[in-house]
Design a protein with these regions (language model features):
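S-adenosyl-L-methionine
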Residues: 1-43, 51-58, 80-106
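Conserved beta-strand/loop positions that form the S-adenosyl-L-methionine
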Residues: 45, 68
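Conserved glycine-rich SAM-binding loop
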Residues: 48
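Short alpha-helix immediately C-terminal to the canonical SAM-binding loop
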Residues: 75-76
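Mobile active-site "lid"/loop adjacent to the S-adenosyl-L-methionine
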Residues: 110-130
Length: 130
């Protein structure tokens, strides 16, 4: 289903900005510093509204989680869930990941979640597929 436009999107993103990474490429090699600890780091590509990643972060406070999503209107829902649960081990960024090496150094991630990614079935969308 298509995501509807959200009123006051920019203001609501700013209100939850503690979880938002503005320039994730600049964080390459510095994720432990950003979290302030050396806990394992797990990445979810395509977090959607954040149900999975926020539940994982709440259940595992000794693991750091990063959620990536390309649509800001969807990310807002994940950020609001993180704010409600006061998750200090979760960071979120808005971007479509094409190459993990642009965001993470080798060995920086401990694991990766890829749940229900967009299928992009048309031939002209091949470049968007995982």
């Amino acid at each position: 289903m298509r995501q509807r436009n959200i009123k006051n999107l920019d203001e609501r993103l700013a209100a939850n900005s503690a979880f938002l990474i503005d320039d994730p490429r600049a964080c390459r090699g510095r994720w432990a510093e950003i979290f302030g600890n050396d806990n394992p780091i797990m990445l979810e590509i395509g977090c959607g509204k954040g149900k999975f990643i926020t539940s994982r972060a709440a259940a595992n406070p000794d693991v750091n989680y990063i959620a990536a999503e390309g649509q800001s209107s969807v990310v807002l829902r994940a950020m609001e869930k993180a704010q409600e649960s006061q998750l200090c081990n979760l960071r979120i960024f808005i971007d479509f990941i094409h190459d993990l090496r642009d965001y993470f150094e080798e060995g920086e991630l401990s694991g990766l979640y890829l749940n229900f990614s967009d299928p992009w079935p048309k031939a002209r969308h091949a470049k968007r597929r995982l």
